[in-house]
Amino acid sequence: MKVNMEYTKEKKVGEGTYAVVYLGCQHSTGRKIAIKEIKTSEFKDGLDMSAIREVKYLQEMQHPNVIELIDIFMAYDNLNLVLEFLPTDLEVVIKDKSILFTPADIKAWMLMTLRGVYHCHRNFILHRDLKPNNLLFSPDGQIKVADFGLARAIPAPHEILTSNVVTRWYRAPELLFGAKHYTSAIDIWSVGVIFAELMLRIPYLPGQNDVDQMEVTFRALGTPTDRDWPEVSSFMTYNKLQIYPPPSRDELRKRFIAASEYALDFMCGMLTMNPQKRWTAVQCLESDYFKELPPPSDPSSIKIRN
């Protein structure tokens, strides 16, 4: 289906709450593209806020590890976003046990992910929904941070925010506690959980609901206390919690048997309970984990199937 002089929609490849995604072609280059058609008719006041956010933030960012917004056009009263075509995602790769990947491959994927996240944070943008199926692969093996439907500008210190963001399994403890003020540290927590999942090849903190998510998180990583996170006990739900000790280093070694000491340091830095002590994207990128052998794989050499 020809949608304007420059683009053709070829087949539907996905559908979400506010958009339908088509595989398409850019005529002038022959390039494969994805066309995200925003369902404006679904919303009485016009565009859904998620669509507005996605357009706003993708227009502001150009980076090799962030999905590229190529163009925007209107057709039949619908807004269409033209995005680079990214054939698969990290969730598919983790789940497909026929795909074998190495510690060097994981290191390459983490490096690309953190470069994309750092670019967001450097531009004062919180992603707020980092998870494996929002990390997409380009045909040459680059990981691209995608889906900015929950993104927002990093807030002023006293600005009140919703804590109902980030897919549950990747939600930082401050969000689980219902914090109304938070920082880019929420994205780093999500990356830490993704790293653990890559090493285990199963979900690391799979809570069944919001209450169970707290139980699962603190059973795995220890219940935070005022000693390591001042005033954490002032959150309303804190007194209902079971107190679990943090895992010992030996317990972490047994859980993550292929992880080096630097890899465990790297993971623990991202999964620090106190958001003010949690590593930043810069600290992650400067970690000894990336300096030790093996070096990160060349992304184009990693064999993944679509």
Swiss-Prot record:
Transmembrane segments: none annotated. It holds the Pfam family Pkinase. InterPro entries: CDK, CDK7, Kinase-like_dom_sf, Prot_kinase_dom, Protein_kinase_ATP_BS, Ser/Thr_kinase_AS. Residues 7-290 form the Protein kinase domain. It catalyses: [DNA-directed RNA polymerase] + ATP = phospho-[DNA-directed RNA polymerase] + ADP + H(+). Present with 4400 molecules/cell in log phase SD medium. Catalytic component of the TFIIK complex (KIN28-CCL1 dimer) which is the protein kinase component of transcription factor IIH (TFIIH) and phosphorylates the C-terminal domain of RNA polymerase II during transition from transcription to elongation after preinitiation complex (PIC) formation, thereby positively regulating transcription. TFIIH (or factor B) is essential for both basal and activated transcription, and is involved in nucleotide excision repair (NER) of damaged DNA. TFIIH has DNA-dependent ATPase activity and is essential for polymerase II transcription in vitro. This is Serine/threonine-protein kinase KIN28. It comes from Saccharomyces cerevisiae (strain ATCC 204508 / S288c). The gene is KIN28.
